[in-house]
């Protein structure tokens, strides 16, 4: 099975199945000399882990990460970083009825049709359990960016569940308030309505979809390339790798269908040194007046905030009775998915979205030479045996 790696220079390779022994990720392309805080990695995993509230699955996974390579005395060595998260609360027995009778709208049949076999416990490789690897990788990417000269900030929050929409909020409000409720919505009134809606579907044995707003600040201009290597092209690929993603938008997104060219096109002016939020822009530089394009023009970053929205359909594992076709017996039959599952995805997907953004931004920064891919201090290829911060001579 291919398709388990993402990135060009900052490469993330994952493995593991939902009910296997462990989940794991190998991160290559991390420069040497980054002080890696393993507690910060764990903190991000804790934001994603199951069982954290009444509106998440009750599966009791501690999601404790073990970093087993690529780090010495707390600093990265430039070699691949390996991280492992053990699965400690898998219960595969409840999935035996679906071995030959695929659950509706899952990957059960398609995996079996393609490979002739599959790990059926908990959905195996197709499970959203796999996103724990991406969050670990994203936490590493965040720390590499923090160690650079660039002040990159990335944040997301749930802006819609079902028909309940949050009011538009500022980036600062998302930073300050998105973690204050179980839904991870920075609008407290909307969050309360969302929670009530989720619980109503949950009690009915059903599920509901939603969306997440994301924003990146401090990303310099000039990242990305035309066509297939454009910044939105690669970020879109990363977002669509998150299970159940049905749409990714940038800037005005789908609302652009109702906007004329003359309304959407943004005039250019000169930076006056006070009015614009553009990375690296100096007084007198040309800058676009607005940012309806979401910080992206021609597939390349403009230096303005990058923002957009990603959408998820309702979780497909629900206890409501549904119909399936058993390919072994040749009969149709009722199935009920009685395992432990989330009634909604966006609240736990927020750290996954942020992780995908961090991984993508760092990869582009390395590709553009904005960050030295060899080491956080010094020139690429510079030879210095005393460089590494853990060297005894640097005490």
UniProtKB/Swiss-Prot annotation:
Glycoprotein in keyword set: no
Pathway this chain belongs to: Metabolic intermediate biosynthesis; chorismate biosynthesis; chorismate from D-erythrose 4-phosphate and phosphoenolpyruvate: step 7/7
Chain intervals for the UniProt region annotation (Disordered): 264-292, 373-395
PROSITE patterns given in the database record: CHORISMATE_SYNTHASE_1, CHORISMATE_SYNTHASE_2, CHORISMATE_SYNTHASE_3
EC category: lyase
Reactions it catalyzes: 5-O-(1-carboxyvinyl)-3-phosphoshikimate = chorismate + phosphate
Keywords attached to this entry: Amino-acid biosynthesis, Aromatic amino acid biosynthesis, FAD, Flavoprotein, FMN, Lyase, NADP
GO molecular function terms attached to this record: chorismate synthase activity; FMN binding
One Gene Ontology cellular component: cytosol
Record-level GO BP terms: amino acid biosynthetic process; aromatic amino acid family biosynthetic process; chorismate biosynthetic process
Cofactor(s), names only, from the UniProt record: FMNH2
Cofactor note: Reduced FMN (FMNH(2)).
InterPro entries attached to this UniProt entry: Chorismate_synth, Chorismate_synth_AroC_sf, Chorismate_synthase_CS
Binding residues annotated for NADP(+), in chain numbering: 48
EC number: 4.2.3.5
Annotated residues for binding of FMN: 125-127, 298, 313-317, 340
Function: This reaction introduces a second double bond into the aromatic ring system.
Protein family membership: Belongs to the chorismate synthase family.
Official protein name in the record: Chorismate synthase
Organism of provenance: Halorubrum lacusprofundi (strain ATCC 49239 / DSM 5036 / JCM 8891 / ACAM 34)
Gene that this sequence comes from: aroC
